[in-house]
Amino acid sequence: MIKYLRIGHGLFSALVAVLFFYQGWLGLKIRRARRSRASIPLAAVKRHRKRGPVLVSLGGLGFLFGLILVIIETGKILFYPLHLFIGLTIVVLLIGTFLISRRIKRPDSPYRTPHFILGIFILLLYVFQSFLGMGILF
């Protein structure tokens, strides 16, 4: 049973990571249009704004599910310390990015660049976390 839950956690987290890469692509598309003073792709803006909070929630759920799974399987929280630390870092950055995004109110907002930089870090950490997770699974 635990074996299937581990695979389920991996698949869920991989799906969330793919959705975050799509979210990042939307954000980059919006940013490029804004910086080149081209017309803003309003459909992309709407999708990016609407999906952001959902993805933050899914990222948090993936972390929580993984944490519970490790506790059930091993009885220890720190059994996979690097995977735990990277997952926790992702969650903290997700929350930070979400909170920063709430402060973006105008086109020249100083919060756009920190939002962008945190998003890049999140994506890089998801890649690293995925490799760590595959090492744990296999």
Language model features by range: what are they?
Residues 1-138:
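Membrane-embedded alpha-helical bundles that constitute the cytochrome b-like, heme-associated redox core
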